[in-house]
C-alpha cells in the first residue's frame, strides 16, 4: 500500500513550490519538486529590444539576484560587441558581487534556514528567542545592500551598470563609508560564528553530492571561463548546453537539468568543494570552526558553506575597498561601443550557483536570440535526488517528521523559484 507525503507550500524560500513524495513497499516510488510559480517569459521579452535595454529588463528576473543577472548579461553583451572593460570596472563589479553574496547568504542562512536548525517555525519565533542573532543577520543583509547600492546605484534592480563600464563611479566618501561598514561587518561575522559553531546538522541526510562550479579566474572567485564538475568533467562557458541539458517535466513550470543522465548541484557547497583552497583568512578560520568537512554527503551543509562564503565576501570586499582608497578611483568613462552583429555567452557565480546568459545580436545591436539558465533550474533534479535520500529510510516515521525532513532539504539549496521560471515554455 502506497503512502503519499505532500508539502503543499514550501515556506521560507523565494517563490512558490511544493513537494510530493510517494512511498511504497519497495521504498520511494516517486518524488516531485513541484514548481508552481507563474511562467515569466523574459527571453522572449528581450528579443527585438536593443542591447542597451537588456540589462535593465533581465534584472527583473529576480530582485535578490538582480545585480548578478545585470552583470552577467553585460558580460555576454560585451563579448558579442567586442568590448573589453577596464581593470577598474572588473574590480567594481567584483565588489558588487561580494555585496550580493553578503546580502543573499545573510538572509538565507539566518532568516530562512537557521529556524530549522534551532527548532523554530519561523524567523519571527527565532527573533523572540534570540533577538541578537536576528539583529546581526539584518545588519549583515543591510551591509550587502549598501555595497550594491553604492556600486550599482540601487540595492535592487541596479541602474548604474552600462555596457563598457559605469554611469557613475563611487566617490572617496562612498568608499570610506563602506570601509567602516565592512569592518563592523567582520565583528558581526564573529558573533554569528559563535552561534553557528554550536549547531549540529541533521543526521538523516547521507547522500553524495555531485558538484559543478566555474573555475575561478585569477583571484576573482565568482568569475570564470569554464565549468568543472567534481567527477572531472570540464566545459568552456560557451559550450554550457553540453552541461545543462534542460528538459521539461510535467510537474513543474521550470525546466530541469541533467548532465550525462545524472543530476548535479551548484552553489556555495559546490564552489567550496571544488575550489575551497582559495578560501583563506577569517573565512578559513570560520570554515574550521563550524566543522565543515568537504566533500560532504549532507546537503544541509550548504548552509554552513554559505556562511563561510559570507565571511569571505565581507573580508574580500574590505580588501577591494582598501585597495581602491589607496590607489584612488580613476575618472574613466564607459568604453565606447559600436553596434555590430555578434554572439556572446557569459557565466558568473551568483549566490545560488552558476548563472548563464547568452545573446545573439543583429547589426543594429538588437537581440535576435536569448538564453538564460539559472542556478536553481540546474539544481532541481538534484533536489529531487536528495529529497528521495531524506525519506528512503523513513517508513516508520510520521508524516509530520517526513514533511519536516523534506522542507529542510529543499530549503538547504536556497532555491530562487522566480529565477527558475524565467524561460519560454510551450504549454
Predicted regions and their residues:
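Active-site catalytic microenvironments in core metabolic enzymes, especially phosphate/sugar-handling
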Residues: 365
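Active-site bordering "gate/hinge" segments
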Residues: 1-354, 374-427
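A translation/RNA-centric and nucleic-acid-associated enzymatic feature enriched
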Residues: 352, 357-359, 369
Amino acid at each position: 500500500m502506497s503512502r503519499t507525503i505532500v508539502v503543499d507550500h514550501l515556506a521560507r524560500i523565494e517563490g512558490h513550490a511544493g513537494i510530493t513524495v510517494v512511498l511504497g513497499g519497495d521504498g520511494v516510488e516517486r518524488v516531485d519538486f513541484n514548481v508552481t510559480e507563474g511562467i515569466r517569459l523574459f527571453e522572449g521579452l528581450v528579443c527585438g529590444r536593443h542591447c542597451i535595454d537588456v540589462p535593465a529588463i533581465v534584472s527583473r528576473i529576480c530582485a535578490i539576484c538582480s545585480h548578478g543577472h545585470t552583470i552577467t548579461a553585460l558580460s555576454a553583451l560585451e563579448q558579442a560587441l567586442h568590448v573589453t572593460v577596464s581593470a577598474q570596472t572588473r574590480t567594481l563589479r567584483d565588489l558588487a558581487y561580494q555585496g550580493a553574496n553578503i546580502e543573499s547568504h545573510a538572509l538565507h542562512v539566518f532568516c530562512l534556514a537557521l529556524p530549522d536548525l534551532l527548532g523554530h517555525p519561523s524567523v519571527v519565533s527565532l527573533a523572540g528567542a534570540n533577538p541578537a542573532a536576528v539583529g546581526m543577520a539584518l545588519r549583515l543583509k543591510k551591509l550587502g545592500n549598501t555595497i550594491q547600492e553604492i556600486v550599482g546605484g540601487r540595492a535592487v534592480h541596479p541602474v548604474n551598470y552600462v555596457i563598457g563600464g559605469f554611469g557613475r563611479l563611487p566617490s572617496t566618501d562612498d568608499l570610506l563609508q563602506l570601509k567602516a561598514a565592512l569592518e563592523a561587518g567582520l565583528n558581526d561575522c564573529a558573533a554569528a560564528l559563535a552561534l553557528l559553531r554550536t549547531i549540529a546538522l541533521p543526521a538523516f541526510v547521507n547522500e553524495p553530492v555531485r558538484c559543478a562550479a566555474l573555475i575561478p579566474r585569477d583571484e576573482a572567485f565568482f568569475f570564470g571561463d569554464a565549468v568543472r564538475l567534481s567527477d572531472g568533467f570540464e566545459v568552456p562557458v560557451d559550450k554550457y548546453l553540453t552541461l545543462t541539458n534542460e528538459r521539461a517535466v510535467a510537474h513543474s513550470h521550470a525546466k530541469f537539468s541533467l548532465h550525462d543522465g545524472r543530476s548535479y548541484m551548484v552553489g556555495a557547497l559546490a564552489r567550496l568543494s571544488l575550489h575551497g583552497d582559495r578560501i583563506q583568512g577569517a573565512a578559513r578560520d570560520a570554515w574550521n570552526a563550524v566543522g565543515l568537512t568537504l566533500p560532504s554527503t549532507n546537503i544541509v551543509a550548504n548552509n554552513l558553506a554559505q556562511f563561510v562564503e559570507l565571511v569571505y565576501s565581507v573580508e574580500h570586499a574590505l580588501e577591494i575597498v582598501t585597495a581602491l582608497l589607496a590607489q584612488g578611483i580613476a575618472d574613466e568613462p564607459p568604453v565606447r561601443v559600436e553596434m555590430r552583429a555578434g554572439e556572446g555567452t557569459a557565466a558568473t557565480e551568483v549566490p545560488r550557483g552558476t548563472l548563464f546568459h547568452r545573446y545573439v545580436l543583429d547589426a543594429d545591436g538588437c537581440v535576435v536570440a536569448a538564453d538564460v539558465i539559472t542556478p536553481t533550474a540546474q539544481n532541481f533534479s538534484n533536489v529531487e535526488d536528495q529529497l528521495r535520500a531524506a525519506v528512503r529510510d523513513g517508513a516508520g516515521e510520521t508524516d509530520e517528521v517526513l514533511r519536516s525532513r523534506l522542507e529542510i532539504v529543499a530549503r538547504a539549496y536556497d532555491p530562487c523559484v522566480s529565477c527558475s521560471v524565467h524561460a519560454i515554455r510551450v504549454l
